[in-house]
Amino acid sequence: MDSFKQNAVVFDCAGTLVEMYRVTKSLKTGQVILDADNLKLISESPGSGLIIMDAPLDLIKNQPPERLLSEFLRSEKIPFGVAFAADGFDAGDISRVLLTDQTKMKSFLETNEEAISYFDDIIYEVFGFIVSSSENKITYIMSTGGKLFENAKDVVTAALENCDVFIASGDDYGNLNRVAEKLGIQKDNVIGLCNDVKKENIILELQNHYPKVIMIGDGLNDLLALNAADLGILISRSNYYTPENLMDAADNIVDDLGECTEILQSYLLE
């Protein structure tokens, strides 16, 4: 990797650069959870993992409602990744569960309609589902809508003055590249479909090339990366799930993205 600047900043995306509204549906009860916290849900469900589909939005939205999710993934050769998982989850179970699963695309279309109605200026639409290794089935499906935080552009622009800027996220590349383009982040510096271990490895790899590597995130799947970074900044908002072990992993805790600029500038001058 050729570095052009002395330092690197890695941003999570959803919840960090993008304000999210998540809609999650239980396939067991039919309950629809508005403004859901999927990482909290998974952390309280041993053996569960959040799977994100990396498919073009138009392709998903134009699917026949009665088409099976499993057939869609297989026939369209849709990549997917594990964004976050609780203890006891086995990624090898995903394909096995899909062999007999009867989840239909209409569930995603319905939750998507609800998710994108929350904001006027949507830039982010994510589709995913939760697999339970212990129950051997898909337990929830989810869709999210998101818009850039108002100060995201200013924070990233300030970081770019002294740092190479990266995005590392569990979400799909289509959404991440759209955000990167809006914020002036190089497409080559976008890494999607990351779980917590992959994020940590990204930090460790960057530390081979930069004297200082900073991680900015907000969720449980950022914990390992925050801990590994030379400086870890956690954004802990009142409506976000922030357990104690996540706070312990960070060097600084803020409640607004905009506070990161001053912390970055001060740290880089040390």
Predicted regions and their residues:
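Donor nucleotide-activated moiety binding/catalytic core segment of transferases
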Residues: 192-212
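Acidic, Mg2+-coordinating phosphoryl-transfer loop and its flanking beta/alpha structural elements
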Residues: 165-173, 210-252
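Hydrophobic/aromatic ligand-binding patch that stacks against planar heteroaromatic rings
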Residues: 157, 179, 205, 224-225, ...
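Short hydrophobic/aromatic-enriched beta-strand-loop microsegments
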Residues: 185-194, 232-237
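Short, charged, surface-exposed secondary-structure boundary motifs
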Residues: 198-204, 242-251, 263-266
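Short acidic-hydrophobic, aromatic-tinged amphipathic segments that line or gate anion-handling sites
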Residues: 188-195, 251-259
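Structural motif corresponding to alpha-helix initiation and N-cap regions
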Residues: 149, 196-200, 219
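Alpha-helical substrate-recognition element adjacent to the catalytic core
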Residues: 2-182, 189
